[in-house]
A protein has these predicted regions:
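Phosphate/ATP-binding catalytic cores across multiple sugar-kinase/actin-like superfamilies
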Residues: 31-59
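Single conserved hydrophobic/aromatic residue that forms the stacking wall/gate
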Residues: 1-5, 9
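A short small-residue
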Residues: 13-28
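Catalytic phosphate/nucleotide-handling subdomain of diverse soluble enzymes
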Residues: 49-130
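Short, flexible active-site recognition loops that position polar ligands and cofactors
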Residues: 22, 35, 123-136
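C-terminal domain-closing interface element
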Residues: 133-146
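Secondary-structure capping and boundary motifs in well-ordered enzyme cores
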Residues: 24-35, 65-69, 90
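Charge-rich, solvent-exposed alpha-helical interaction surfaces
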Residues: 12, 16, 138-141
């Protein structure tokens, strides 16, 4: 982001916090923390909605793409959702393209074999929930803000 765009986002975040009687982030680190905490709590909100649509339990959350490289966000997401977060692959789009080519060429027979190939080829990182009680309290507060 350009500096001007970044300033706009920071101003919007600070205004939202002030309007909702929340601590106003002043430093860059505080703004980033505010964003990451908000993302992690929003992921939980979406996950809870999705759980209501599926009869199967969700045992882990898989994060792919560029965001999967951010260990702090992945840990906070695991904390917020209360289940392990499995991060990676970061280049999911390119890998998906390669897997479709492998399927077409006969190197993979189905989705299961493609997943097995990816799991053997690309290291994934698992984040285990920590401080769940603190994050549960933060989530209840988050819901009151929405």
């Amino acid at each position: 982001l350009s500096s001007a765009a970044s300033d706009v986002y920071k101003r919007q975040i600070r205004t939202y916090c002030a309007d909702h009687h929340q601590p106003i982030p002043e430093t860059r680190g505080q703004v980033v923390r505010c964003i990451f905490e908000s993302l992690a709590l929003r992921y939980r909100q979406v996950l809870e909605n999705l759980r209501g649509l599926s009869p199967r339990p969700v045992e882990a959350l898989h994060v792919i793409g560029g965001g999967s490289r951010n260990d702090l966000l992945n840990q906070w997401t695991a904390n917020a959702v209360g289940i392990p977060v499995v991060a990676g692959p970061s280049e999911a789009t390119a890998i998906g393209n390669v897997m479709i080519q492998a399927l077409t060429a006969g190197a993979a027979s189905d989705v299961v074999s493609m997943r097995q190939l990816i799991n053997r080829s690309i290291p994934l990182k698992t984040f285990t929930p920590e401080n769940v009680e603190v994050w549960n309290a933060a989530y209840l507060h988050f819901l009151q803000l929405a």
